[in-house]
């Protein structure tokens, strides 16, 4: 993202910086549909000539071709690639431009050609708009020996036409990227790139040369396609530094006490949590606690816990709270819906209340004591609401920042005081880069859904975070990781973040599915899925249902299809604007749309009350993702149902892990699925091949201390057979 005057926005937040791209009454179509007359805002905007002031050339044409002649020498200077969108550098069209007087015979430039300008040759004349927002003067181009002509239709890595033709910095030869200005290249000027576009980067990210309007099958506004600038998981969080200026400011959450402390109703199986087996590994773990009173929390925290409806601890809370209070690093694995958020928030808040806080709205630089990072915007906002609930009536202030919202709004929230910063990775690194927060006071670093935070999607950003100037080393801070799944390779990566003596807590059948969720696997071909989905949803009625698909385009397609079938449906995925995502979740929560079609952006950590059904229209590529998806139902002891469509052609690799997950959760395993698993993996296949009651175990070699404990009595016990072990969510 280019530099912006955030101080001005902070001082005058009520002044909008948005400038409309087109004003309908400012131009009109001529008789032939080619010419658009426009009254300019200033003479400098369109150039000095009167003919330029009287006309506005509308960029675009959804074509992979460009208007105007191509410099014959250019083919040797840049790749021979077609440009998608307005006025690119591909094939030229003669006599298709816009002229003040008339089209002259043999003139193929046409772009507001002024008869008063004496062009020495066709190449110079065809450039048009010399030394302004459109096409740079031919002599400058020749002298520079490289393609620096503003945004002539967005070639190679430049997404917007009409760049500012600065001969000094539009094209960075060392970086090999062009920076653009103008409506589709710059975010500062809505019409012609009159603002300096040099500081703005191309939006395409992947180097695609996409121009003014949508071309081919790619989406210009959302940036979807194979060179999409948004990440699927975080919905564009990694793309916060690209694209048009974001002006969306999310509405503040309700401030009344009843809304803050609205709580989940526990289900009929909540009391089964006491029978769950827990394994703690590492040196000298502290004893677990049985009640909130044993945690020695301050009275304000105890009052907030009671208001939130918390009456008893879940297994992960019984072990994690004393470990965190003892200052130990922690990696905790617990099934979905098990209260992991409260497990780390309560001891952190207790420490802050006891030791005091440093951040204040009266300080120029905010230095939070705790940073919590999660992979999706929806999840981090959910964590923030929990932090706000538990810190109600205290001096601790929690702040949430995430992508898809105005960066100035995020900064304004921070400067008002920030003790606990809840953030998604991209927006966090943006704010750190702007030097709006300091890291010297960080005492707690929390990674929620840590397996996702450390994989290839966010691993580099997390490593960049812990190496930022001022960030305390892992020996000087306390690092906490929570997730429902912790693959072995992720545990190895975690060594860079955690102290060597960290404790590992595994609760129940970690990495397995909850037995409160009834799982059904149906063998459905790819082209029969839609009809089967409609059949199931009609039988379900208005019960709240989440439908998971693999791609963003399919999410919108299925949602539209279901609406045509008179089934009220909305969708959420990474290409939707943040306001649309929040609106979709709001419609789903309130029951306006009982069906939500989602990609994996909604599979992680979202806690939506009373979701009765999860349907895997497309099975995910990994069994861990399957566990996270079906974990959206059957939470806090409530029951739920998960139905998955199994396609033989695309899902066979999941047969073996599916059989294991179903067996561990004491679910019926279809005979046809066992046959596929047996034929795929051979006669040695076993549904419980690992032989462990814990699906995720500490992978450290020769770690000292390991105990299997029952959460009710906390006595060491022999691990029971999985078939006899009660499960929970």
Curated annotation (Swiss-Prot):
Its EC number is 3.6.4.13. It is an enzyme of class 3 (hydrolase). A motif (Q motif) lies at residues 290-318. Keywords: ATP-binding, Cytoplasm, Developmental protein, Differentiation, Helicase, Hydrolase, Meiosis, Nucleotide-binding, Phosphoprotein, Repeat, RNA-mediated gene silencing, Spermatogenesis. GO terms for biological process: cell differentiation; gamete generation; germ cell development; male meiosis I; male meiotic nuclear division; piRNA processing; spermatogenesis; transposable element silencing by piRNA-mediated DNA methylation. A motif (DEAD box) lies at residues 448-451. Residues 532-677 form the Helicase C-terminal domain. The keyword Transferase does not apply. PROSITE patterns: DEAD_ATP_HELICASE, HELICASE_ATP_BIND_1, HELICASE_CTER, Q_MOTIF. Found in a mRNP complex, at least composed of TDRD1, TDRD6, TDRD7 and DDX4. Interacts with RANBP9. Interacts with RANBP10. Interacts with PIWIL2 and MAEL. Interacts with BMAL1 and CLOCK. Interacts with Tex19.1 and, probably, Tex19.2. Interacts with RBM46. Belongs to the DEAD box helicase family. DDX4/VASA subfamily. This is Probable ATP-dependent RNA helicase DDX4. It comes from Bos taurus (Bovine). The lineage of its organism: Eukaryota, Metazoa, Chordata, Craniata, Vertebrata. The gene is DDX4.
């Amino acid at each position: 993202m280019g530099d912006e005057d955030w101080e001005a926005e902070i001082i005058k937040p009520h002044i909008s910086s948005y400038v409309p791209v087109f004003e309908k009454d400012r131009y009109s179509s001529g008789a032939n549909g080619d010419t658009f007359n426009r009254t300019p805002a200033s003479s400098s905007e369109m150039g000095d000539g009167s003919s330029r002031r009287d006309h506005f050339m509308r960029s675009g044409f959804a074509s992979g071709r460009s208007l105007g002649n191509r410099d014959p020498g250019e083919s040797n200077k840049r790749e021979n690639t077609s440009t998608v969108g307005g006025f690119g550098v591909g094939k030229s069209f003669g006599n298709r431009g816009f002229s003040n007087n008339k089209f002259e015979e043999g003139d193929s430039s046409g772009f507001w050609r002024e008869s008063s300008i004496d062009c020495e040759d066709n190449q110079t004349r065809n450039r048009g708009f010399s030394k302004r927002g459109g096409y740079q003067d031919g002599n400058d181009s020749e002298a520079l020996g490289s393609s620096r002509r503003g945004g002539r239709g967005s070639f190679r890595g430049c997404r917007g036409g009409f760049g500012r033709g600065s001969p000094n910095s539009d094209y960075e030869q060392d970086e090999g990227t062009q920076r653009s200005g103008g409506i589709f290249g710059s975010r500062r000027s809505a019409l012609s790139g009159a603002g300096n576009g040099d500081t703005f980067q191309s939006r395409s990210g992947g180097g695609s040369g996409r121009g003014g309007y949508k071309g081919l099958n790619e989406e210009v506004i959302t940036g979807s396609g194979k060179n999409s600038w948004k990440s699927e998981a975080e919905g564009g969080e990694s793309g916060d530094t690209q694209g048009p200026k974001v002006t969306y400011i999310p509405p503040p959450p309700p401030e009344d006490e009843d809304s803050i402390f609205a709580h989940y109703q526990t289900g009929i199986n909540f009391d089964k949590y006491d029978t769950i087996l827990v394994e703690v590994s590492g040196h000298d773990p502290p004893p677990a606690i049985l009640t909130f009173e044993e945690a020695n929390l301050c009275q304000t925290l105890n009052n907030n816990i009671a208001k939130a409806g918390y009456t008893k601890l879940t297994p992960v809370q019984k072990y994690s709270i004393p470990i965190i209070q003892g200052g130990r690093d922690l990696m905790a694995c617990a099934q979905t819906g098990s209260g992991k958020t409260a497990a780390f928030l309560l001891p952190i808040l207790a420490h802050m209340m006891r030791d005091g806080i440093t951040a204040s709205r009266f300080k120029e630089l905010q230095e939070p004591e705790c940073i919590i990072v999660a992979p999706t915007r929806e999840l981090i906002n959910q964590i923030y609401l929990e932090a706000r609930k538990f810190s109600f009536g205290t001096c601790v202030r929690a702040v949430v920042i995430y992508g898809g919202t105005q960066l100035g709004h995020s900064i304004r929230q921070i400067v008002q005081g920030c003790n606990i910063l809840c953030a998604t990775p991209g927006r966090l690194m943006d704010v750190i880069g702007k030097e709006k927060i300091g890291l010297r006071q960080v005492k707690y670093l929390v990674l929620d859904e840590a397996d996702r935070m450390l994989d290839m999607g966010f691993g580099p950003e997390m490593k960049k975070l812990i190496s930022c100037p001022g960030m305390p080393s892992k020996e000087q801070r306390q690092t906490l990781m929570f997730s429902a799944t912790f693959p072995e390779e992720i545990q190895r990566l975690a060594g860079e973040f955690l102290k060597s003596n960290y404790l590992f807590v595994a609760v129940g059948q970690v990495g397995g599915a909850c037995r409160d969720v009834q799982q059904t696997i149906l063998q459905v071909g790819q082209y029969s899925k839609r009809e089967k989905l409609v059949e199931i949803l009609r039988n379900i009625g208005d019960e709240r249902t989440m439908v998971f698909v693999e791609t963003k385009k399919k999410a919108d397609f299925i949602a539209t299809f279901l609406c045509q079938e008179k089934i009220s449906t909305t969708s959420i995925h990474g290409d939707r604007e943040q306001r649309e995502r929040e609106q979709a979740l709001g419609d789903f929560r309130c029951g306006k749309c009982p069906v939500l079609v989602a990609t994996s952006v909604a599979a992680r950590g979202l806690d939506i009350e009373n979701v009765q059904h999860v349907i895997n229209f497309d099975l995910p590529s990994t069994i861990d993702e399957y566990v996270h998806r079906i974990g959206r139902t059957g939470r806090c002891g409530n029951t739920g149902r998960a139905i998955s469509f199994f396609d033989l052609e695309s899902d066979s690799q999941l047969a073996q892990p599916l059989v294991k997950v179903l067996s561990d959760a004491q679910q019926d395993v279809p005979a046809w699925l066992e046959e596929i698993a047996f034929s795929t993996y051979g006669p040695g296949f076993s549904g419980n091949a690992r032989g462990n009651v814990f699906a995720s175990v500490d992978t450290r070699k020769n770690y000292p201390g390991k105990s299997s404990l029952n959460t009710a009595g906390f006595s060491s016990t022999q691990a029971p057979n999985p078939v006899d072990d009660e499960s929970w969510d």
